Amino acid sequence: MGRNWSKKSRRTAVGAVRRSGAPLALTLAVSLLGLTACGGDGDGGSDSPSASGSGSEQPPQGPDRLGPAPSAVPSVRQWKAVRGPGWQRTDRTRVVPGSDSLRDEAKLLADELKVPVAKGPSRTGDIELKRGEDGGKSPGGKVNGGPESYRLVSSDGKITITGGGDAGVFYGTRTLLQTWRAQGRFAEGTVADAPDRPQRGFSLDIARKNFSADWIKARIREMGDLKLNQLQLHLSDDQAFRVESETHPEIVSDPHLTKAQVRDIVGLAASRHITVIPEIDSPGHLGAVLKAHPELQLRSASGATPRGAIDISKPAAAKLVDELLVEFADLFPGKWAHAGGDEYQALMTENPEQTYPGLAKKAREEFGDKATVQDLATAWLNDRASTLDKQGKIPQVWNDGMHRGGVVKPNKPREVAYWTGREAGERQPSEYLKEGWKIVNLNDEYLYYVLGQPNNFTYPTGRRIYEEWTPAVVRGTDPVPDKWAGRDRILGGRFAVWGDLADAQTTGQVARGIRLPLAATAQKLWDPQRPERSWDDFVKLVDKVD
């Protein structure tokens, strides 16, 4: 991860419909509705996003004029403008939820626009929220996003947002809110929108660098506006363990998040349809745990103690880590959990069996004479994934915890978070995809913001992500073949912040530094096609919608 590469140097390097190489369902939807697509959207950088704004007022839209496309980040995928007055917020504007289940979505939008929530039939000036086939299954709704799809109709001074699910309704409100911030109105017309990838997120290392609960919540609000839906928290590493633990209070560092703060974070994320994914990395990156449990420290034949490496030959090591995984499964109720698996120092030596004879002996005892330390490490990660599976979680692991060959094979179900092509064995993304694994893209060439820029890392730019990267670019700068690039194989991606040199930036500098890259990542996960807006125009738009 941006993590310890004291490892090898990683770098080597209204009218016609827009046809964007999208799936057949999208093309059919466009053909049926005659929707036109709008361009890309913008980026910026601040410590916390603004709650609402008055927008940049546009000239009144006359009945004979076509209004501008929505201003949203990420950009809407289909837009059809028609002649009409459009919508503006007035003193009579209300948000009208079509059911009690949408009341939370209605209240959030109403608070942002500073208007009331109301029951009953909608009227001119209102914003109506509802769920139904128009959002999830109609030609204009289900582009390919299911519950995250939505249809927004601006007609005769009223807005109607129909989502395939609650998330789709929420995303429709984001498009409306951002457009109002940028334009002060919403033109007459219809939006049909849905994400290209189901997993779209941000990964944050809170172990090496402490980030306050308020800072994390500010990012969640920012993520919600960007239609991102996952927040991965790297909870523990060699430097610290940053969350309160009742099963093992002895490992917890100061400062740390209390469980009450975590519940608050998880609750805010849920209100923005964001799943918080906890990561307790093992069998490496456990230095903070081992400080409290030196008896579990891995030792080499010469007595050396590789930092953060737990002795996976000891049953007590597995017991401790499993207890933490089970404890935090309840605290983080989402369907994913991350088991780590990267950079285990025992596998980063030239001859693991000679350097760590205790591990080699245990491997042979458990798996036969041909077994190696790699097999023992694979079995360790299998067991941790199994623990998470029993808790109802989908396990995710780093790609350098997935090894070629060996007596013991990685088990399923699990998803592979691909971050590096410089691990021992250097397995290409295509190798994982050929084997049937599903990948989440955290390509360190584009998506790693490593504090202090150690080991040839450089701070990523939003421009490179916006102009070059797509979910299919998993390693380096080259995409995987099209036959493996679909959303059923590459599930999405996450932009990641790692705190290798924690004091290199303040938390405020981090917030400002990641603002544009995070917006660009959101754009390309929502629609991976080359944006129609230039980068400079994208930046201007981000500033307007924030």
Stretches found by the model and what they are:
Residues 2-34, 38-167, 175-176, 182-190, ...:
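Acidic, contiguous N-terminal accessory segments
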Residues 307-413, 419, 424, 429:
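Active-site neighborhood of glycoside hydrolase catalytic domains
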Residues 287-290, 348-357, 407, 450-458, ...:
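Histidine/acidic-residue-rich catalytic or RNA/ligand-binding cores of hydrolases
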Residues 207, 236-240, 279-285, 342-344, ...:
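Active-site beta-loop-alpha junctions enriched in small/polar residues
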Residues 199-203, 230-232, 273-277, 336-338, ...:
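Structural preference for beta-strand elements that scaffold enzyme active sites
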Residues 395-400, 409-546:
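Flexible, acidic glycine-rich loops studded with aromatic residues
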